[in-house]
Swiss-Prot record:
It comes from Staphylococcus epidermidis (strain ATCC 35984 / DSM 28319 / BCRC 17069 / CCUG 31568 / BM 3577 / RP62A). Binds 2 manganese ions per subunit. This is Formimidoylglutamase. Its cofactor is Mn(2+). Belongs to the arginase family. The keyword Phosphoprotein does not apply. Its EC number is 3.5.3.8. It comes from the Bacteria. PANTHER family: ARGINASE/AGMATINASE (PTHR11358), FORMIMIDOYLGLUTAMASE (PTHR11358:SF35). It catalyses: N-formimidoyl-L-glutamate + H2O = formamide + L-glutamate.
């Protein structure tokens, strides 16, 4: 169910009402209704769309609460300074789950997200469970029906479970099983967070991955080269970040906290190596769970990640 943006989420410290160099995002954000827009190609500005859904997390036997993530992220983002004043940012609201099956909600979200991806230079999709990734893929494939798609995921988990239905742990298996023209690269894999069956599937499907242990201190030149080659080898790139990849000391508000996760600055550096590419039209950020957050640390981390990628 599509819900329009809530303007009351967008508040913050007011430093000036007249000097744009002192403006914050709550002063410059605009609001839009994707249901009223056609499938047009404009390639300007940035779109925000929330995936206020954690049904996939529930189906994956995780701890729920991520459906409140999009609004928590927007609240935290609203008060950050607008340092990229040349790019218009439009909040298109959220999609909520009210269908019998999760896949039907994913398709509804995909239809709306596709309009934003088509219309804007980049679209940030805010979750919500990581089942957002399959919806993001459906949207990407709608916009680019013939293109090769490179899926880059910063995540502690492969999320390639074989369940026979959509959950937060099945998105990338669904993509690979349905699309011979899609490939998958995962950065941040936890050796303690994936079964041998998932590693076997990764080998079977030629999934490229980097362990979290390899990203503890810096992004090494071989990993940088791997990312660059992967982007180069595909027509379009779908980028997604699961916040459970970040160590729980920095990101307690997630569906599945990481005991040995990677540091926020490493995620920022990885993102900065992906997002500047013109092939990246959509970025999803998943599993931000306000129920378990502390002092809004995780919401602020996600907000700063989006902010960091815009400047």
């Amino acid at each position: 169910m599509y819900q329009l943006a809530q303007s009351n989420l967008w508040t913050g410290r007011l430093d000036s009402e007249t000097d744009p160099t002192q403006f914050r995002h709550f002063q410059t954000v605009k609001f839009g209704d994707l249901s009223q827009l056609d499938f047009s190609d404009e390639h300007k500005g940035v779109g925000l769309l929330g995936y206020a859904i954690d049904k996939g997390v529930e189906l994956n036997k995780g701890r729920v609460g991520a459906k409140e993530g999009p609004n928590a992220i927007k609240r935290a983002f609203a008060g950050l300074p607008d340092l990229n004043q040349c790019e218009e940012i439009i909040d298109y609201g959220n999609v909520e789950h009210n269908h019998e099956l999760l896949i039907d909600t994913q398709r509804e979200f995909a239809d709306l997200a596709a309009k934003s991806i088509k219309r804007h230079k980049q679209t940030f999709l805010l979750g919500g469970g990581h089942d957002i990734a399959y919806a993001q893929y459906l949207a990407t494939r709608k916009v680019y029906p013939e293109s090769s798609i490179g899926v880059i995921n910063i995540d502690a988990h492969f999320d390639t479970r074989d369940e026979g239905y959509s959950t937060s742990g099945t998105s990338f298996r669904q993509i690979l099983e349905e699309d011979d023209n899609a490939d998958y690269l995962v950065l941040g894999i936890s050796q303690g967070g994936n079964t041998q069956a998932l590693f076997n599937y990764a080998k079977e499907k030629d999934i490229q991955f980097v362990y979290a242990d390899e990203l503890l201190h810096q992004v090494s030149p071989p990993i940088k080269d791997m990312i660059e080659r992967f982007i180069h080898n595909h027509d379009t790139v779908m980028f997604t970040i699961c916040m459970d990849v970040v160590d729980s000391a920095f990101a307690p508000g997630v569906s599945a906290p990481a005991v040995l996760g990677i540091y926020p600055h490493t995620v920022f550096e990885l993102a900065k190596r992906v997002i500047p590419s013109e092939k990246v039209k959509s970025i999803s950020i998943a599993e931000m769970n306000p129920t378990y957050d502390s002092d809004q640390r995780t919401a602020k981390l996600v907000a700063n990640l989006v902010h960091h990628c815009l400047i």
